[in-house]
């Protein structure tokens, strides 16, 4: 099973992914916890079209590792995956290509090389201000990905997707971890 945990910066994705991983391991599952972007590209900067292409290439390489772990019987949990690229690069791609519709069409085409798709997509929801407050407390600096306008745009795109489960990132961690675990248990018989 492949699970992607998505949401804006500061939503609590990493915290939830780690907590869910620990719970599943306690329940006897072998879990591979990963993240995107990988370390190979984490500090790359460029315009949104360049970033989408670079992140897709990074994901193309990453999916090989994911496929291997899935074939070995691991539950794979990814802190971000393909929907994050759409959320964060859509606005710039739309500006470059003339419309959001054209940008989505182009992004879909470029993303066709990504053949490993999550079985379960989880959205951790928080207000942009909550995300910004958490980012400031975490490291004190805001990157260009973490600007209010960019997070608002990302949140808009995230909300346009259908999700298997949405959780409130302001709820206690135990509550949202158990909520996701119960969903997985009921939905797919964990």
From Swiss-Prot:
UniProt catalytic activity: dTMP + ATP = dTDP + ADP
EC number: 2.7.4.9
Keywords from the UniProt entry: ATP-binding, Kinase, Nucleotide biosynthesis, Nucleotide-binding, Transferase
Record keyword Phosphoprotein present: no
Binding, ATP: 7-14
Example of a GO MF term: dTMP kinase activity
Pfam families in the record: Thymidylate_kin
GO CC entries: cytosol
Superkingdom in the source lineage: Archaea
InterPro entries: P-loop_NTPase, Thymidylate_kin-like_dom, Thymidylate_kinase
Single Gene Ontology BP annotation: dUDP biosynthetic process
Family in the record: Belongs to the thymidylate kinase family.
Protein name: Probable thymidylate kinase
Annotated organism of origin: Thermoplasma volcanium (strain ATCC 51530 / DSM 4299 / JCM 9571 / NBRC 15438 / GSS1)
Gene: tmk
């Amino acid at each position: 099973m492949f699970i992607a945990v998505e949401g804006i910066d500061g939503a609590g994705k990493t915290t939830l992914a780690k907590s869910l991983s620990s719970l599943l391991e306690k329940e006897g599952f072998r879990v591979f916890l990963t993240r995107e972007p990988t370390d190979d590209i984490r500090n790359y900067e460029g315009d949104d079209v360049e970033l989408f292409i670079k992140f897709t290439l990074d994901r193309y390489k990453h999916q090989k590792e994911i496929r291997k772990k899935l074939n070995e019987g691991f539950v794979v949990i990814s802190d971000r995956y393909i929907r994050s690229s759409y959320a964060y690069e859509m606005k710039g791609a739309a500006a470059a290509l003339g419309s959001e519709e054209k940008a989505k069409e182009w992004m879909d085409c470029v993303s066709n090389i990504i053949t490993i798709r999550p079985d379960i997509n989880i959205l951790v929801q928080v207000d942009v201000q909550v995300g910004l407050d958490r980012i400031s407390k975490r490291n004190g600096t805001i990157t260009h990905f973490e600007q209010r306008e960019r997070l608002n745009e990302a949140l808009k795109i995230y909300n346009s997707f259908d999700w298997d489960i949405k959780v409130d990132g302001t709820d206690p961690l135990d509550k949202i971890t158990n909520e996701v675990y119960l969903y997985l248990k009921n939905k797919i018989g964990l």
